[in-house]
């Protein structure tokens, strides 16, 4: 367990104008004043705050960082904090982010200090306009300071979990009422038994790793999705609503087939096909690690899918379409006999019903556990597409996502009337590792990225996820596929 010392105050927005702060409350920079701290642990920091609540001899000093969204990440564990008020009295605060617990032990006089400060401010503020209790939030802070502390901490936690780690603190609150409160603090942490000391320095908070950092990271890793490009963390709960785009660099991360269907197909119009079709073990593939059937079963439990592709009929901006979406999370999106059969049946249905066709590709290629049966799916799908495109003159759009490799690239992935790729998608026939091991040559960086291949003419469009649905809708209407409800 870690022990932390910090001087703290509960600070409302309106105090900024009365106390003459040199910087706004939305800033993470230091706040200057002339008073000196009496705490030997933080005396050298020399970042102070002006008198608070009209008291020139205020001992609230060395107030440096906003304890809000940016700094909550340093306290993601159950820890006890020792808090010193302006009178030099110390109090124990228990902080449990997981269970939303914030308790002050022996905190009566500490809360009284807060109430006194708020009372002083309230009198000076309301005396000028002749009102004492017009503000409904005044009573909230006056008579239930413990509640306001809990509210503030819970708000900090919730806002942090809905943002990336290095988000600017000025977007934490946008309301104009008085309920927004901040805790400004100067933190000097001391890990029990180790002698490692941490402190704030300027506008950057430096925290050295403690012995339980790894455990804390593992404990909360299920809350985050790490970007493959910038390694930033994205809150998983809101990640889906952001189309799996990194909030920090905009990188397109992998999406599940269900999320893609939800992105492209109008709500309530999705009608799946061949959901009960599952893989057997046609060649009785032998594996010392895990039998093929057991591996398929494990992926079915993990993903909730029966195979690496979902096919069905739906509406895209009210335009009826046939769509197949591959899922890389199911055995790397590998194309086996079931995947090939489901896509072939989808194409045949679209041919019969004269529907436009979309196939979202995300695959590592043919499934080796099914041998030549998986390879023949390339020819089978291509044959069905020939009838769909050449004989029926219908419109097919493949969408190449990361990664699209192997047999999918060599067959239906590159047979579209208009081929669309996502930004930064990895598209290749043979992967980088296979090429380098086979030819003993280094593959140039970025030579298998969508932007480079677009310059070489391998596909027609690079479309981000945000406008993808509207782009497809315009393409379909250009090819005489119109919405059902159009007059």
From Swiss-Prot:
Every CoA carboxyltransferase N-terminal domain range: 223-487
Reactions listed under catalytic activity: N(6)-carboxybiotinyl-L-lysyl-[protein] + acetyl-CoA = N(6)-biotinyl-L-lysyl-[protein] + malonyl-CoA
Cofactor note: Binds 1 zinc ion per subunit.
Top-tier EC class: transferase
Cellular component terms per the entry's GO annotation: acetyl-CoA carboxylase complex; chloroplast stroma
Binding of Zn(2+), residues: 227, 230, 246, 249
InterPro entries noted in UniProt: AcCoA_carboxyl_beta, Acetyl_CoA_COase_Trfase_b_su, ClpP/crotonase-like_dom_sf, COA_CT_N
EC number(s) on file: 2.1.3.15
Subcellular location, record wording: Plastid, Chloroplast stroma
Gene Ontology BP, a term: fatty acid biosynthetic process
KW Nucleotide-binding (keyword) present: yes
Molecular function in Gene Ontology: acetyl-CoA carboxylase activity; ATP binding; carboxyl- or carbamoyltransferase activity; zinc ion binding
Database matches in SUPFAM superfamilies: ClpP/crotonase
Keywords: ATP-binding, Chloroplast, Fatty acid biosynthesis, Fatty acid metabolism, Lipid biosynthesis, Lipid metabolism, Metal-binding, Nucleotide-binding, Plastid, Transferase, Zinc, Zinc-finger
ZnF (C4-type) ranges: 227-249
One Pfam family hit: Carboxyl_trans
Keyword Nucleotide-binding: yes
Cofactor(s) needed by this chain: Zn(2+)
Pathway the protein contributes to: Lipid metabolism; malonyl-CoA biosynthesis; malonyl-CoA from acetyl-CoA: step 1/1
Family: Belongs to the AccD/PCCB family.
Annotated function: Component of the acetyl coenzyme A carboxylase (ACC) complex. Biotin carboxylase (BC) catalyzes the carboxylation of biotin on its carrier protein (BCCP) and then the CO(2) group is transferred by the transcarboxylase to acetyl-CoA to form malonyl-CoA.
Subunit structure and binding partners: Acetyl-CoA carboxylase is a heterohexamer composed of biotin carboxyl carrier protein, biotin carboxylase and 2 subunits each of ACCase subunit alpha and ACCase plastid-coded subunit beta (accD).
Protein name, UniProt field: Acetyl-coenzyme A carboxylase carboxyl transferase subunit beta, chloroplastic
Gene this protein is translated from: accD
């Amino acid at each position: 367990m870690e022990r932390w010392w910090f001087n703290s105050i509960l600070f409302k927005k309106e105090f900024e104008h009365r106390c003459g702060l040199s910087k706004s409350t939305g800033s993470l920079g230091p706040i200057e004043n002339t008073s000196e701290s009496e705490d030997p642990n933080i005396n050298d920091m020399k970042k102070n705050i002006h008198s608070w609540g009209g008291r020139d001899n205020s001992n609230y000093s060395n107030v440096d960082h906003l304890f809000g969204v940016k700094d909550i990440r340093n306290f993601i564990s159950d820890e006890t904090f020792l808090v010193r008020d302006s009178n030099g009295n110390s109090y124990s605060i228990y902080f449990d982010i997981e269970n939303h617990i914030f308790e002050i032990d022996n905190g009566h006089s500490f809360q009284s200090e807060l109430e006194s400060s708020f009372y002083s401010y309230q009198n000076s503020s309301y005396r000028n306009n002749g009102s004492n209790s017009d503000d409904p939030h005044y009573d909230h802070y006056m008579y239930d300071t413990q509640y306001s502390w809990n509210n503030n901490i819970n708000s900090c936690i919730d806002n942090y979990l809905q943002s990336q780690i290095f988000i600017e603190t000025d977007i934490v609150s946008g309301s104009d009422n008085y309920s927004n409160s901040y805790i400004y603090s100067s933190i000097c942490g001391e890990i029990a038994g180790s002698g490692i000391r941490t402190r704030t320095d300027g506008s950057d908070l430096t925290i050295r790793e403690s012995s339980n950092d790894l455990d804390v990271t593992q404990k909360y890793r299920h809350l985050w999705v790490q970007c493959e490009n910038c390694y930033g963390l994205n809150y998983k709960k809101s990640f889906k609503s952001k189309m799996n785009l990194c909030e920090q660099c905009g990188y397109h991360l992998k999406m599940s087939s269900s999320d893609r269907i939800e992105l492209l197909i109008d709500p309530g119009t999705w009608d799946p096909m061949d959901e009960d079709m599952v893989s057997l073990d046609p060649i009785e593939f032998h594996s010392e690690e895990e039998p093929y059937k057991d591996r398929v079963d494990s992926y079915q439990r993990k993903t909730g899918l029966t195979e690496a592709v979902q096919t069905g009929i739906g509406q895209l901006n009210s335009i009826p379409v046939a769509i197949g979406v591959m899922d890389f999370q199911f055995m790397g999106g590998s194309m086996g006999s079931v995947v090939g059969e489901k896509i072939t049946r989808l194409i045949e249905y679209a041919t019969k019903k004269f529907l436009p066709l979309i196939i979202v590709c995300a695959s590592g290629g043919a499934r080796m556990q099914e041998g030549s049966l998986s390879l023949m799916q390339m020819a089978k799908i291509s044959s069905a597409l020939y009838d769909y495109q050449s004989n029926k003159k219908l419109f097919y759009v493949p969408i190449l996502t990361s990664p699209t490799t192997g047999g999918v690239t060599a067959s239906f992935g590159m047979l579209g009337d208009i081929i669309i790729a996502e930004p930064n998608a990895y598209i290749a026939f043979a992967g980088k590792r296979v090429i380098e091991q086979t030819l003993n040559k280094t593959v140039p960086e970025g030579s298998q990225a969508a932007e480079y291949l677009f310059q070489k003419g391998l596909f027609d469009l690079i479309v981000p996820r945000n406008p993808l649905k509207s782009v497809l809708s315009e393409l379909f209407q250009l090819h005489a596929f119109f919405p059902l409800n159009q007059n």
